[in-house]
Amino acid sequence: MAAAAALSGAGAPPAGGGAGGGGSPPGGWAVARLEGREFEYLMKKRSVTIGRNSSQGSVDVSMGHSSFISRRHLEIFTPPGGGHSAAAPEPAQPRPDAGGDFYLRCLGKNGVFVDGVFQRRGAPPLQLPRVCTFRFPSTNIKITFTALSSEKREKQEAPESPVKPVQPHISPLTINIPDTMAHLISPLPSPTGTISAANSCPSSPRGAGSSGYKVGRVMPSDLSLMADNSQPENEKEASGGDSPKDDSKPPYSYAQLIVQAITMAPDKQLTLNGIYTHITKNYPYYRTADKGWQNSIRHNLSLNRYFIKVPRSQEEPGKGSFWRIDPASESKLVEQAFRKRRPRGVPCFRTPLGPLSSRSAPASPNHAGVLSAHSSGAQTPESLSREGSPAPLEPEPGASQPKLAVIQEARFAQSAPGSPLSSQPVLITVQRQLPPAIKPVTYTVATPVTTPTSQPPVVQTVHVVHQIPAVSVTSVAGLAPANTYTVAGQAVVTQAAVLAPPNPEPQENGDHREVRVKVEPVPAISPATLGAASRIIQTSQGTPVQTVTIVQQAPLGQHQLPIKTVTQNGAHVVPMPTAVHSQVNNAAASPLHMLATHASASASLPTKRQNGDQAEQPELKRVKAEDGESIVIALSVDAPPAAVREKAIQN
């Protein structure tokens, strides 16, 4: 590269054949400035050449060793003014205050772009505006030309000048790549010179492989270059110029470019060459880009079913077939022809459902957690779309019901291939409320009607209050001393007496349990009402009194007494027979059938003893029937206290 200092005296002969071409303005005034990526050149001569140094000679501004740049590529000159000669004490110098006395002549075979307008080799000299940009084709090498007027020469050293080597003011569209990252970037030269966010993400199928950026340091000159380009481009766009200034890659697919070209044709058809011409005319990016985009155009025309090939008639001159758009899809394609595509690298999905979403941040494959439905409530979109979350049931006012914690296992459906949530179970703890409390069940215990007694028989109703899930134990106290076991209907009805009143006693866990018994007198039951009973068994008066434990809560169905292995006096084992089922009169069994049904269908559940003694084996009850047969009845009973038992034996 040429040095940043101004060159004077040495250089190419003046263009246009004027005399005094080598002279310099008095005082070394700079009349123009050439600014590149890594250099700044102050023009103090009438003519300046730009190219690359070679054995055939040197140039004023060397642009390196790129093969796309000729040895003598550009020449910037000013015409001689006022017929001054070389011997004149004050040579003719450009009139920078005029602002339009600088011309450019293209000498290179590849031509040059001046503010996006191509200038070919051998074209007439182009009068330059006050500020313009040169770009060499097939490269991203740019030079900014700035004409310096007499009023601006004094401001040349001001800090606010954009050409001063100050710290770069990073623009939102500028990509600053450190030198240490240079080896990671593609070495291919970029066919476009505009560094923009849209161009940094290739939008065509071949964009990623056909273009790249040559890494260099971002200098203030690049920033001023983009700032200087913005005003002329906007002015020309406002004036309705045909040639767009933006030479960045257009955000359209190849199919969209083809549709644009065909629809803008007068007869709605174009040849392949006509499509190429339309694209290069409207999008300067494809003028200097790699020719691979033309192959993509041909492939789209051949493979896309929306494009129809129409042979050329023999009367029409030229060669090549025409291409048209399928009339059935023309309206839809034209509507989408100018719809800009989203640049690559921009996320096109949203994550509205938090961290468990399968697209946002997938959880670790080894992660399995327990979520509480009351605390977190986190769910995946898949679970929300397929089945609802189990909602907890609120307890009724005034009711204290125990709740059971149920752990359920749920597997989330797979939303994307390879999702780690598809194979790992997630446990959800759900609080479920048990069914409402069962109302108190009424048991009717009747004195035997076959026992001769002078006192009228008394029927007492016992209300048993239950609490879920514990099994209630109700003791009946205050009944007659006689113990009668009546086999009626489908079960065994038992009447017993408790010698000791129930008292609240501490249990193993420190809690107290209190048994509530409500006794209500009811009308006596006559022998006629129990006439349908199949068999009545009466025990003797001397039988020791036992305490009966009633186990509640079982569904109705086939009722049988539980079969147990019981011992009598700890000596031998007697099998437990099953109660005989028989038909019973509905009218007579209304009080007895209820107790028999619940007692026979109850499950055998362990209960705690109120007196805290060691559990003893249940005693076997042998009674004699009227016909002399013996029936063995096993009862889960609690033995009376020792003092009461001794007293009963003495009696």
Curated annotation (Swiss-Prot):
The cysteines covalently paired via disulfide bonds are: none
**Function description:** Transcriptional regulator involved in different processes such as glucose metabolism, aerobic glycolysis and autophagy. Recognizes and binds the forkhead DNA sequence motif (5'-GTAAACA-3') and can both act as a transcription activator or repressor, depending on the context. Together with FOXK1, acts as a key regulator of metabolic reprogramming towards aerobic glycolysis, a process in which glucose is converted to lactate in the presence of oxygen.
Record text on subunit structure and interactions: Component of SIN3A-, but not SIN3B-, containing multiprotein complexes. Interacts with DVL1, DVL2 (when phosphorylated) and DVL3; the interaction induces DVL2 nuclear translocation. Interacts with SUDS3. Interacts with BAP1 (when phosphorylated); leading to recruit the PR-DUB complex and repress FOXK2 target genes. Accessory component of the polycomb repressive deubiquitinase (PR-DUB) complex, at least composed of BAP1, one of ASXL1, ASXL2 or (probably) ASXL3 and one of MBD5 or MBD6. The PR-DUB core associates with a number of accessory proteins, including FOXK1, FOXK2, KDM1B, HCFC1 and OGT.
Residue ranges occupied by any FHA domain in the UniProt entry: 48-119
UniProt-recorded name of the protein? Forkhead box protein K2
Spell out the molecular function terms from Gene Ontology.
DNA-binding transcription activator activity, RNA polymerase II-specific; DNA-binding transcription factor activity; DNA-binding transcription repressor activity, RNA polymerase II-specific; magnesium ion binding; RNA polymerase II cis-regulatory region sequence-specific DNA binding; sequence-specific DNA binding; transcription cis-regulatory region binding
Identify the coding gene.
Answer: Foxk2
Question: Where are the annotated segments for DNA-binding?
Answer: 291-309, 319-323, 339-344
Q: Gly residues bias located where?
A: 14-26
* Regions of compositional bias (Basic and acidic residues) in chain numbering: 233-249
Q: Which UniProt keywords apply?
A: Activator, Cytoplasm, DNA-binding, Isopeptide bond, Magnesium, Metal-binding, Methylation, Nucleus, Phosphoprotein, Repressor, Transcription, Transcription regulation, Ubl conjugation, Ubl conjugation pathway
Biased composition annotated in UniProt, kind: Polar residues: 194-203, 373-383, 601-614
Required for interaction with DVL2 and SUDS3: annotated segments: 120-162
Task: Cite the InterPro entries for this sequence.
Answer: FH_FOXK2, FHA_dom, FHA_FOXK2, Fork_head_dom, SMAD_FHA_dom_sf, TF_fork_head_CS_1, TF_fork_head_CS_2, WH-like_DNA-bd_sf
* Region spans: Disordered: 1-29, 150-171, 194-251, 350-399, 601-623
Q: Name one GO cellular component term.
A: mitochondrion
